[in-house]
Swiss-Prot record:
Organism annotation: Chelativorans sp. (strain BNC1)
Location, primary (coarse class): cytoplasm
PANTHER family, per database record: HISTIDINE BIOSYNTHESIS BIFUNCTIONAL PROTEIN (PTHR42945), HISTIDINE BIOSYNTHESIS BIFUNCTIONAL PROTEIN HIS7 (PTHR42945:SF1)
HAMAP family named in the record: HisE
Molecular function, one GO term: ATP binding
Family annotation (SUPFAM superfamilies): all-alpha NTP pyrophosphatases
Gene Ontology terms describing biological process: L-histidine biosynthetic process
UniProt GO cellular component terms: cytoplasm
UniProt keyword terms in alphabetical order: Amino-acid biosynthesis, ATP-binding, Cytoplasm, Histidine biosynthesis, Hydrolase, Nucleotide-binding
Catalytic activity: 1-(5-phospho-beta-D-ribosyl)-ATP + H2O = 1-(5-phospho-beta-D-ribosyl)-5'-AMP + diphosphate + H(+)
Pfam families: PRA-PH (PF01503)
Protein name: Phosphoribosyl-ATP pyrophosphatase
Amino acid sequence: MNEFDLSRLEGIIAERANSGDTQSWTARLISAGMDKAAKKLGEEAVETVIAAVARDKKALIAESADLVYHWLVVLKIAGVRLDEVMLELESRTGRSGIAEKESRGKPPESAA
């Protein structure tokens, strides 16, 4: 099993964000701001969906990695820590997805 995890990636992103290294994609993306980072996140989400629909496992793995990385960059820019997201997910365990959505005033989606 790989020892690399999201917390470690979050730490690397934080280090690079503060590095001032003009050769760091992370530093450049963060300095470009939320609009640029969110756009990249959206692009990676679409590419992940395309890979999933195509049932291309190799592409799905690669695009998922890109998606997670860009998601963590967006969280960094927004000042949201990964542990805050994990606490939210933890608070939802033990509840059905339908009940959780209803608690937020969202109608449940059809699975069809």
